[in-house]
Each structure stands twice: as structure tokens, then as C-alpha cells.
Amino acid sequence: IKSEIEISEFIVNDYVNDDNVDIVVKQGSMPEKIKKQRDEENIARFYDGNEIWFYIKNVGTYYIKEAKTILVEPEEGYIFNDLKAFLIWRSMAACLLQKDIVTIHGSAVIINEKAVIFTGRSGSGKSTLTAAFRKDTYKFLSDELCVLSIDEDQYPIVNPGYPQQRLAKNTLEGLGFNCNDFIISKESNQMYSVPANNDFVNTPIKLA
């Protein structure tokens, strides 16, 4: 990923260049057709295979094209962490959809050397359960989105995400953490960015 918007949560890859980059993230104005749909027709989201865009009030508009480009147009007075949150999760998920890559809405830990995914609706406790396993010394693989593929033995594997979780204030407090030690990731929902560098496994793991 090559991004004009700093995504401090992601692992830096010094070998990315214009020849091998998969996704380019740019910041700028939306195409006129999207502006018209958004501003005149009050449309907040659009999906048509190779083109996906969505609008988040007080945050910005995101346009994902052909699984290669993400264009972000911030709203005036936006909060950077909110802007970044919708880029990391919803926009990247749209790219995976366009690439026809199987992605599960869930979080994954490693149990008995296999990846276990906790999945469910938003707010069902996926990240909370994952954080509890992390606290009990289990290794961490991915939060919110689990990207699946098939290895050379035709076995499903879970690919690593990045070394961070997004947790709610009550979850952090319930697990005995001090919220003041973490950065707010999405201020409107009081979500905090929680590093997982010591628990993170940056290699694909077979699905349990």
C-alpha cells in the first residue's frame, strides 16, 4: 500500500515502489459524478462492482476504484483519527471485495498453532474476546477483518492483519487497562487504538 495519508498502525514496507504497489491511497476532490450524487441527490453510498464510494457525515467521502485506488476527500473540520478509521476498515474491506478475496468480519488469535476466528455482528464482542485471549498470553493475528487464502496444500489460511486492535472504553476498563495510556481511534464511538506488537504474529496461519 502506498498512501498519501499516514497510517501509523500499518507495518512499514521499505520495498514498496510504483512497480509492486497493490493499492494507492490519495487525498483529493471527488469526481464530479460523485459530488452530484452526494450533494444534489443526497446519496450516501454507491456500489457497482469496480466502483464503490461512501460518505460519512463530518468525516469525509471515500471512493474505491478497481481495487487499486482509494480516493479520500475529508469534510471541513474533520477529525484525523475518524478519517483514518474509515480508511483502514471500511475502505480496505471494499478493496478486498473488489479483488474477490474471501474476508470474514471477525478477529483472530492463535490456539494450538491454528488460527481461530471470532465472528459476529458489530458490537457482539469479537475484539473484546480477542483482547481477553491476548491478555491470557495467546498470540494475535488480526482484528476486525480476517483475510483468507489457500496454501500450497489446499488448506485455508488466515493472513496477518497489523499489530493493533480497536477497543471500546468499557472493554479496556473491564480488562484492567487505563484508557489514558492509549490514543482515541474513533472519537465519536470512544474507540481506542491498542498496540499488539508483542503478541502479533506476522505470518499466515492455518485455519482451525
Predicted regions and their residues:
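Glycine-rich, often acidic-flanked micro-motifs
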Residues: 1-14, 107, 111-121, 135-208
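Functionally constrained cores in energy, signaling, and assembly domains
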Residues: 3, 9, 27-28, 45, ...
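Extreme N-terminal, non-catalytic leader segments
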Residues: 55-115, 192
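Post-Walker A alpha-helix
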Residues: 129-130
